[in-house]
A protein has these predicted regions:
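Conserved C-terminal alpha-helix-loop-beta "cap" of PLP-dependent enzymes
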Residues: 1-177
Length: 178
């Protein structure tokens, strides 16, 4: 790969390709697998246009945004890097952010805000967003431009990440009483 502008764009392109493949795996396969266990996975941005995927997890039947936020924080706690626990190094890492009502709750011309559709799919009302004031959103970044090239290989990082994420989500959901 050239060490000039053309090489830089190849790195960016491969990173975005990797995140789009991860998006498809999560949106098409993982969300269906989790649904059979009564777990909802909502992936944002169809398809991703940068090297970032944001997603939210909820348990079927849970209509409390506060409880859903707790669930997503617990999932992040399992897959985050903690420098205080140097011996606990997750194979993959995710992070968490908050979408606040002040930023994402403003109504558009159609009377809806940018989170309405996502929350509806997850079983959470828009009123909950207004009263709680924030939604905890999980995210992961593909920083390896060769992730897409590992597809079908050993290891296939997209498959391994999806398997790790699924096991973590199922374990956390089973340990929390929602």
């Amino acid at each position: 790969m050239p060490l000039d502008r053309s090489g830089y764009w190849q790195l960016i392109g491969k990173s975005i390709q990797g995140v789009q493949e991860l998006y498809l795996k999560c949106e098409k396969d993982l969300s269906l697998e989790l649904a059979s266990s009564g777990i909802k996975l909502r992936v944002f941005t169809d398809p991703p246009d940068i090297n970032l995927i944001c997603f939210i997890v909820n348990k079927d039947g849970n209509s409390s945004l506060s409880r859903m936020n707790e669930l997503n924080k617990a999932i992040c706690d399992e897959l985050k890097f903690d420098p205080a626990e140097i011996t606990k190094r997750p194979e993959f890492m995710i992070s968490i952010t908050e979408f606040t009502y002040d930023q994402y709750g403003l109504e558009g011309f159609d009377g809806k805000n940018s989170m309405d559709e996502h929350l509806q799919v997850l079983g959470i009302s828009s009123r909950e967003f207004g009263s709680v004031g924030r939604v905890s959103v999980l995210r992961c970044t593909i920083i390896n431009p060769w992730c897409a090239l590992s597809r079908g290989g050993k290891p296939d990082y997209v498959e391994v990440f999806a398997t790790t994420l699924k096991a973590t989500i199922e374990r956390v959901v089973s340990n929390l009483s929602l």
